[in-house]
Regions:
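Short, small-residue-biased leader/transition segments that mark boundaries at the very start
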Residues: 1-5
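Short alpha-helical transmembrane interface motifs in multi-pass membrane proteins
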Residues: 7-8, 96
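Alpha-helical linker/hinge and terminal dimerization helices associated
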Residues: 14, 18-21, 25, 59, ...
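N-terminal helix-turn-helix DNA-binding core of bacterial DNA-binding proteins
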Residues: 16, 20-65
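A cross-family signal for key residues in well-ordered alpha-helices
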Residues: 42-43, 57, 104, 130, ...
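Charged, amphipathic alpha-helical coiled-coil/dimerization segments
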Residues: 71-131
Length: 142
């Protein structure tokens, strides 16, 4: 009952606070991306030239949200849509030079932000909390 509600709010608050901090740290260091764009870039730095559907699956976003996100990232010259050679109807999302060059700085800032967020926690505490969140996710994912 109310316990679940408190936990939901806490988790929501925690991730919202981390995202705000990440946004601020990006901005203050001249990296003009949102936390949502960060998750897309993170995936593309590992595996470039993927379908929009792959990005949806990786980031748990729906099609319309992802379309908007990619549109904005295209306007910022971070990514470009290129028709798939095997299937002209499908666009593959590729990093631009700008998108690739952002990686070092953005990862550095994100790691710094994470360190700030996790300061004072022991490795054991982190491990337990990850295990707990993994179990919760496993319980509720479709």
């Amino acid at each position: 009952g109310s316990e679940m509600c408190i936990r939901d709010r806490l988790n929501g608050k925690v991730s919202a606070a981390i995202n705000r901090k990440l946004s601020r740290n990006f901005r203050q260091n001249g990296v003009e991306i949102t936390p949502e764009q960060w998750t897309v870039l993170l995936f593309l730095w590992e595996k470039d030239g993927v379908t929009q559907q792959e990005l949806c699956n990786a980031t748990f976003k729906d099609k319309p949200s992802m379309t908007r996100l990619i549109d904005n990232m295209e306007r910022q010259h971070l990514v470009v849509r290129i028709a798939d050679k095997r299937d002209r109807r499908t666009n593959l999302i590729h990093l631009t030079k700008t998108g690739r060059e952002l990686e070092g700085k953005a990862r550095f800032i994100a790691n710094k932000t994470l360190k700030e967020a996790l300061q004072g926690l022991t490795l054991e505490e982190l491990k337990v909390s990850q295990d707990v969140l993994r179990k919760v996710f496993t319980n509720i994912k479709d």
